Design a protein with these regions (language model features):
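Substrate-binding/active-site clefts of carbohydrate-active enzymes
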Residues: 1-59, 64-85, 97-103
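Short, solvent-exposed loop/turn segments at the edges of secondary structure
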Residues: 29-31, 58-60, 127, 131, ...
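Active-site-proximal helices and loops of the catalytic beta/alpha 8
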Residues: 67-172
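Loop/helix patches that line or flank the sugar-binding groove of alpha-linked glycan CAZymes
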Residues: 162-191
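Solvent-exposed, flexible loop/coil residues
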Residues: 11-12, 40, 136, 148-150, ...
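Generic secondary-structure boundary/loop-capping signal
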Residues: 18, 33-35, 121, 129, ...
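Conserved protein kinase catalytic core
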Residues: 3, 72-73, 119, 179-182
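Short conserved micro-motifs at the rims of enzyme active sites and ligand-binding pockets
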Residues: 51, 122-123, 181-185
Length: 191
């Protein structure tokens, strides 16, 4: 990424230790590419300026932050359980970005692919952000004709999840999940 190459360790092929934009190594599991350091004012400025540009130049109606749980300064290493626990710093950083978005385009959506503890997701929902709700399993079961295992409650029903209203965006297909069409063809009882 060009922003990482501004402070680049060519020998180790990673950002330098003094980079104000990126960590040398990711602070969490499931990282893809380089991990931006959202605790620095430089990265916060860069992120907010990018959000502003996209809102004003392209008149988009909001953002979906992929792997939003990765916006953290805590070093979780490979501990997925610890990474998913309540993180007040992460909540406040995401809230700051959300407020920035709202200051430019009131009503714009902030959708988070978050998958953290329910308490953290509830707090983010109470602050006006929406959580990506995984309903892939249920949708695939329904598409395959297995009605008894296709309860959409958790992925779709914000009340069942204990979330504030309008804070869950369910999805039935994703680049991170098994292909629904393949499973329907190979295992479905509807064909």
């Amino acid at each position: 990424a060009p922003i990482c190459q501004l402070y680049w360790d060519a020998v180790n092929f990673r950002p330098t230790a003094n980079s104000p934009y990126a960590y040398q190594t990711a602070k969490h599991p499931f990282n893809v590419g380089y991990d931006l350091n959202h605790s620095t004012t430089q990265t916060q400025y860069y992120t907010k300026r990018t959000l502003k540009y996209l809102l004003e130049e392209y008149n988009i109606d909001g953002f979906r932050f992929d792997l939003s749980k990765g916006i953290t300064q805590n070093d979780y290493g490979t501990d997925v359980t610890a990474w998913g626990r309540y993180d007040a710093w992460r909540i406040n950083r995401l809230d700051d970005y959300h407020k920035h978005i709202q200051s430019i385009s009131p009503g714009a959506f902030t959708i988070l692919e978050h998958f953290a503890d329910v308490d953290e997701e509830k707090e983010l929902g109470n602050r006006g952000m929406m959580m990506w709700g995984n309903a892939v399993y249920q949708a695939t079961e329904a598409a395959m004709g297995f009605v008894n295992t296709s309860d959409f409650g958790w992925g779709v029903d914000y009340i069942k999840r204990g979330m504030p209203g309008n804070s869950v965006i369910a999805y039935a297909s994703s680049h991170d999940e098994e292909r629904m069409g393949y499973k329907c063809k190979m295992f479905g009882n509807a064909f």
